[in-house]
């Protein structure tokens, strides 16, 4: 009834051919780190493949996502679930977690990351994920984590049903076995989403801001903090900057600085939505640079 101990296997090198030609768009995407909790990861040998490579690949993706202003969302199941709440899951997997609920240390959430409680296979079920995606105007989901043929596949299916493009990272997920892993990727690539390697995903993300010289959401946050004589921690990327004291003169000064670094954004666009997150999304959307795989 419990999750079986998982034998070591290598992450697949050859990925299935996608039926769709979707590309990751940093202004539309969210990175999901799915169920990378100590409880689930401990069924693997953490010193043997696929875990070392899986962790490295998710770290690489997260670094690229942060640089490009892509939000990062974590899911995690709670401990000591009420049997009535857990319901049919208990028939397949027993009572669930009693401890080890934390995300593994190498992938621990950082300030600004979103953390959601997860109750079912799909990250969408009984969670605010769908509402949050719609509120933030995001309609792409980059999916990493465990287990590919259970939560990853279910989440990709639900994303597709909700008109959110799922991108499953073929070497950024792990499963009970190589055969389960490969089955999941074949199904997703042919029926419900796009499968990318970590390298492909990072290239597509990086291509969209390669025109920018040293400009990122983080550097813009520092620039705004300096202009308003605030600490960086006081500048929330989703807060209306007018409430923090931004005026048109300082907005123009910031605009000129960012244009010199390659940003394509007008003063009218700057003042239409006065948050750093929305400014960065506009800059990303205006790049119009073809993606490369």
Swiss-Prot record:
Its top-level enzyme class, in one word, is hydrolase
Extract the signal peptide range. none
Membrane spanning segments where? none
Residues forming the Carrier domain are 211-287
Q: InterPro entries from the xrefs? A: ACP-like_sf, Isochorismatase, Isochorismatase-like_dom, Isochorismatase-like_hydrls, Isochorismatase-like_sf, PP-bd_ACP
Any GO BP annotation: vibriobactin biosynthetic process
What EC number(s) does its UniProt record assign?
3.3.2.1
Question: What's this protein's family per the entry?
Answer: Belongs to the isochorismatase family.
Query: What is the name attached to this protein's record?
Result: Vibriobactin-specific isochorismatase
Organism of origin: Vibrio cholerae serotype O1 (strain ATCC 39315 / El Tor Inaba N16961)
State the organism's lineage: Bacteria, Pseudomonadati, Pseudomonadota, Gammaproteobacteria, Vibrionales
Write the gene name: vibB
């Amino acid at each position: 009834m419990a999750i079986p101990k998982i034998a070591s296997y290598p992450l697949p090198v050859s990925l299935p051919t996608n039926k769709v030609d979707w590309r990751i768009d940093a202004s539309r995407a969210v990175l999901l780190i799915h169920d990378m909790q100590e409880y689930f990861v401990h069924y693997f040998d953490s010193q043997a493949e696929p875990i070392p490579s899986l962790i490295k690949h998710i770290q690489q993706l997260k670094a690229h996502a942060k640089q490009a202003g892509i939000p990062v969302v974590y899911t995690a199941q709670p401990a000591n679930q009420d049997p009535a709440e857990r319901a049919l899951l208990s028939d397949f997997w027993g009572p669930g977690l009693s401890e080890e609920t934390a995300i593994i240390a190498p992938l621990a959430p950082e300030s600004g990351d979103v953390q959601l409680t997860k109750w079912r296979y799909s990250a969408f079920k009984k969670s605010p994920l769908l509402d949050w995606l719609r509120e933030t105007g995001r309609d792409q989901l980059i999916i990493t984590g465990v287990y590919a043929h259970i939560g990853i596949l279910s989440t990709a299916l639900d994303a597709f049903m909700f008109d959110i493009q799922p991108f499953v990272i073929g070497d950024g997920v792990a499963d009970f076995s190589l055969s389960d892993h490969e089955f999941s990727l074949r199904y997703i690539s042919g029926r419900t989403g796009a499968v990318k390697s970590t390298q492909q995903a990072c290239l597509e993300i990086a291509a969209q801001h390669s025109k920018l010289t040293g400009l990122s959401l983080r550097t813009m946050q520092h620039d705004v903090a300096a202009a308003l004589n605030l600490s960086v921690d006081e500048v929330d990327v989703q807060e209306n900057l007018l409430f923090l004291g931004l005026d048109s003169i300082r907005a123009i000064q910031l605009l000129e600085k960012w244009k010199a670094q390659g940003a394509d954004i007008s003063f009218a666009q700057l003042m239409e939505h006065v948050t750093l997150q929305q400014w960065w999304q506009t800059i990303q959307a205006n790049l119009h640079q073809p993606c490369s795989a």
